[in-house]
A protein has these predicted regions:
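Alpha/beta-hydrolase fold nucleophile elbow
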Residues: 152-164
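Conserved alpha/beta-hydrolase "acid-adjacent" motif
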Residues: 319-326
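Short beta-strand/loop motif that positions the catalytic acidic residue
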Residues: 312-314
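C-terminal, loop-rich substrate-recognition/catalytic regions characterized by aromatic stacking residues
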Residues: 232-236, 243-264, 358-642
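Cap/lid segment of the alpha/beta-hydrolase catalytic domain
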Residues: 65-149, 198-199, 356-367, 513, ...
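Accessory cap/linker subdomain of secreted extracellular hydrolases
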Residues: 86-89, 98, 120-123, 130-133, ...
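C-terminal motif of bacterial Sec signal peptides marking the signal peptidase cleavage site
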Residues: 14-16
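N-terminal cap/lid segment of alpha/beta-hydrolase-fold proteins
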Residues: 28-63, 488-494, 567
């Protein structure tokens, strides 16, 4: 089996043989802290259907008092396995590790040392009638029931947290929650694979190509547990990812990467079906059909028990999971008004708040020092301590919304999110590349979308797992291309604070029958802006085009994600794109810019620009260069804080 890449969505903790130390507050914490202060026990907990889930329990050696349980359920392994092998760090953060918690990690059903069959984002079952009717909610319930009744020195209170996929399981835990579950923190949580991670508004994220096998490779012996990685990630023969995917052509040509000739998995007999069942799902379900809808979790957050407090955490520049946490927070808030439900929205990439790195940057952009450390000590620890160790009332001392203004670079607190005082304001994509509050005469702005020369999503030439830094990348390189339309304000005479979602209301046409539409919101910095010392050598902050938010819509889904339809050639058509929330001030002396384009490669796959029923089955001959038009009565609806 090929070398396994140890990154896996921020989920596997690297274990080092070399003893190091980490500064926490005024103390030094060594990598042997966990082994010195905790006992470790591994158990296989039986679920209601008899399947056992492998669970690792770290309990404080000081048994003179009771402790709450904090748990994480993961598909990425609760390693290291074995009684004498300890993680170097446990719990959500080092403060909680030191403060005294019973910390539990569990391999979810069908993964690693747990029995059973794994389903990628297992669908919720609202009608459990027999002990064979299970889902992730019932597995969490059964696990908590066992823990509170069998783990010594627990105080009867349980919390759950997780980042990315473990965040999905944290959200799942609040559906049909166990009475002992008092606090849950879904962080960068997956909610629906059609809008996060592998798709954005129906466009397939080609940048996730190498991650597919992580979820779609069957275990060698079916449902039999295994303690080593059984999957490999596709090796690309070049460092130039852009050129590689351009040369590969249609998506159907990538099937060969999911035929695991060296793996101990049975070959599937059906022609055109690979060994990777997730790749097969992606290919066979190009639309938001019943399969994808059933796996979504947002629709099941309408009846969250008020006994569970939730703190949703999202990174403002999370390239992987931004839709998930924001929609999780908003839907719990909408349907469970009496619940304790808070949002933390900070200047991080995927899971950046869990790392302690002093200087807080995303890509080349610097936001300040100690931001993640502040979150861990004064927000996250405070939340769990209050609901698991304190009286658990709603007076936690934390605000409803703890949000970071990524323009002013400071924290703000609000009683609601979006905050009171937000008004909707349209800005128009006006002639002569202007962005104005008042509409002007309607004109047509055309550009050629050359299928052989798609717009890159980044200047970097590299092969990456899932790109992150592009979320704050300098967009000058794109602004200077002929197939990227640019609309820009004059220099701001006063601050403009954007707080909430953004709606791009485009009016477009195409000579073809299919097209993607990408909108980017950009903060253009002044010419005298000083450079941050950690920037890439070829970049300067002078005139830096900071991408504040961006989004794509696969045009076939402009009216329905379940029922796609072609464009009528040369017919003016409305295309509305929802961009995720921002909290960013375009400061005085800066400019606000909007870029519109139709390719974003290889972040997303290429649209053939001629309509086919399934792009995963498109032929080379389907791909055509087209001319696209944006009409200047198009507008961008901003949420402006006054």
């Amino acid at each position: 089996m090929k070398q396994f890449f140890t990154f896996i969505l921020l989920a596997i903790v690297l274990i080092s043989c070399r003893k190091t130390t980490q500064k926490v507050a005024n103390a030094e914490v060594s990598d042997t802290y966990v082994e010195d202060n905790y006992t470790k026990k591994e158990v296989d907990i039986a679920m209601r259907d008899g399947v056992t889930l492998h669970t690792t329990i770290y309990s404080p050696k000081d048994t003179s008092k009771e402790y709450p349980i904090i748990m994480q359920r993961t598909p990425y392994s609760s390693q290291p396995y074995g009684a004498g092998n300890f993680k170097s760090k446990i719990a959500p953060n080092i403060h909680m590790m030191q403060d005294g918690y019973i910390v539990v990690y569990q391999d979810v059903r069908g993964r690693w040392l747990s029995e059973g069959h794994y389903e990628n984002m297992r669908a919720y079952n609202p009608n459990k009638k027999t002990e064979q009717d299970i889902d992730e909610s019932s597995d969490t319930y059964d696990t908590i029931e066992w823990l509170v009744n069998n783990v010594e020195n627990n105080n009867g209170n349980v919390g759950i947290w997780g980042i990315s996929y473990p965040g999905f399981y944290s959200t799942y835990a609040v559906v049909d929650a166990h009475p002992a579950l008092k606090a849950a923190s879904p962080q960068a949580s997956i909610a629906d694979f059609f809008f996060d991670d592998f798709h954005h508004n129906g466009a397939y994220l080609l940048s996730y190509f190498r991650a597919t096998s992580l979820f779609g490779t069957p275990r060698p012996d079916g449902d039999k547990p295994i303690d080593t990685a059984w999957y490999t990630l596709p090796d690309l023969p070049t460092e130039d990812q852009y050129q590689f995917f351009l040369d590969e052509g249609p998506l159907k040509n990538l099937d060969r990467f999911f035929e695991y000739e060296t793996a101990d998995t049975p070959r599937m007999a059906k022609e055109g079906v690979t060994d990777d069942y997730f790749w097969n799902e992606l290919k066979e379900h190009p639309n938001y059909d019943e399969m994808w809808q059933s796996k979504g979790l947002i629709q099941h957050l309408k009846d969250v028990k008020p006994t569970v407090a939730t703190m949703v955490v999202a990174g403002e520049f999370d390239a992987e999971d931004l839709y998930g946490p924001l929609e999780t927070y908003k839907n719990i808030e909408k349907y469970n008004a009496d619940n304790y439900n808070t949002l933390v929205f900070g200047p991080w990439d995927h899971g950046g708040w869990a790392r302690r790195k002093g200087q807080n940057t995303v890509g080349n952009y610097y936001f300040g020092d100690g931001i993640s450390e502040f979150f861990q000590e004064h927000i996250e620890t405070k939340f769990f301590d209050h609901f698991l160790k304190g009286d658990g009332d709603k007076n936690s001392g934390l605000p409803e919304a703890y949000v970071f203004d990524t323009g002013r670079k400071d924290w703000k607190t609000y009683d609601t999110w979006p905050p009171a005082g937000v008004v909707k304001k349209d800005m128009y994509l006006s002639p002569d590349q202007e962005l104005t509050f008042e509409p002007k005469e309607v004109e047509e702005v055309k550009f050629i979308s050359d299928i052989k020369k798609p717009v890159p999503y980044s200047e970097d030439i590299k092969t990456v797992f899932t790109p992150r830094k592009y979320m704050t990348d300098d967009q000058r390189f794109a602004a200077r291309r002929g197939d990227v339309l640019v609309f820009e304000t004059d220099v701001m005479q006063e601050d403009l604070t954007l707080a909430g979602d953004i709606l791009a209301k485009l009016k477009v046409a195409t000579t073809g029958t299919a097209a993607d539409w990408i909108v980017k919101i950009i903060d253009v910095h002044p010419a005298d802006e000083p450079a941050y010392e950690g920037m890439q050598d070829h970049l300067k902050m002078s005139n830096y085009h900071l991408m504040v938010r961006s989004e794509v819509l696969r045009g076939r889904f402009r009216n329905s994600f379940a029922n796609p339809e072609p464009f009528v050639p040369n017919e003016k058509t409305d295309v509305t794109i929802k961009l995720q929330d921002v909290f960013h001030t375009i400061k005085k002396g800066h400019k606000l810019q909007v870029q519109v384009q139709s390719t974003w490669f290889p972040l997303i796959d290429l649209n053939p620009q001629t309509y086919v029923d399934n792009i995963f089955e498109a032929e080379e001959s389907d791909f055509k260069t087209q001319t696209h038009t944006v009409f200047t009565d198009s507008s961008i609806e901003f949420s402006v804080l006054e």
